[in-house]
């Protein structure tokens, strides 16, 4: 009888340990590696759509391995809001938009991800993105834009430039809705 109680108590302790380890692992993964986010709004259309859910790779924040063209999640004011945008300008870059073409440091940058949006705009005799710049991105700042350029608040028009500390991470995978699981590019 004493042996049964001891085994039962030991099993309970083992379960508690397993649950605690699992909770610690979940905390560590969400804090340092991956975290889910919900796309809010149409500013990244047609790349990402309202209410899609994506996993964000937070580890790149620690390595600083951001690349022009990455889709990033950014903290808004006081971390109460989040923005999903495309990273356009890195620290030290000069950004300019002329005749619907993006120029980074004086060289035309191919925005293949805007092909569909540009076609729709040009079919309506419009430019997708109004001319601006040149804008010099200061040290430790980042310039972002939404892919839905005519319907996006971003570094051009209200959000301004972002600090490195404001970048939560880089989009890794769209996981919901299930019929549209993909890596957005």
Curated annotation (Swiss-Prot):
EC number, UniProt record: 3.4.21.89
Key word Isomerase present: no
Pfam family, any one: Peptidase_S26
EC main group: hydrolase
Membrane topology qualifier: Single-pass type II membrane protein
Active-site positions on this chain: 43, 85
Cellular compartment(s): Cell membrane
Chief subcellular location: membrane
Residue spans, topological domain Extracellular: 35-185
MF GO annotations: serine-type endopeptidase activity
Transmembrane segments: 15-34
PANTHER family on file: CHLOROPLAST PROCESSING PEPTIDASE (PTHR43390:SF1), SIGNAL PEPTIDASE I (PTHR43390)
Family: Belongs to the peptidase S26 family.
The protein's name: Signal peptidase I P
Gene, per the UniProt record: sipP
């Amino acid at each position: 009888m004493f042996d049964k109680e001891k085994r039962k108590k030991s099993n309970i302790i083992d379960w508690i340990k397993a649950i605690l380890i699992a909770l610690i692992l979940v905390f560590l993964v969400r804090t340092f590696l991956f975290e889910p986010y919900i796309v809010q709004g149409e500013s990244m259309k047609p790349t990402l759509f309202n209410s899609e859910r994506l996993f964000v790779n937070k580890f790149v924040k620690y390595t600083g391995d951001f690349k022009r063209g990455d889709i990033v999640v950014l903290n808004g004011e006081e971390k109460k809001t989040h923005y999903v945008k495309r990273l356009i300008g890195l620290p030290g870059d000069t950004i300019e938009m002329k005749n619907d073409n993006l120029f980074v440091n004086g060289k035309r940058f191919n925005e293949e991800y805007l092909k569909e949006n540009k076609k729709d705009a040009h079919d309506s005799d419009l430019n997708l993105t109004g001319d601006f710049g040149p804008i010099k991105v200061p040290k430790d700042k980042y310039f972002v834009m939404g892919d839905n350029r005519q319907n996006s608040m971003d570094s051009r028009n209200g959000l301004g430039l972002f600090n490195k500390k404001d970048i939560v991470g880089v989009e890794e995978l769209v996981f919901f809705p299930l019929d549209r699981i993909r890596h957005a590019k």
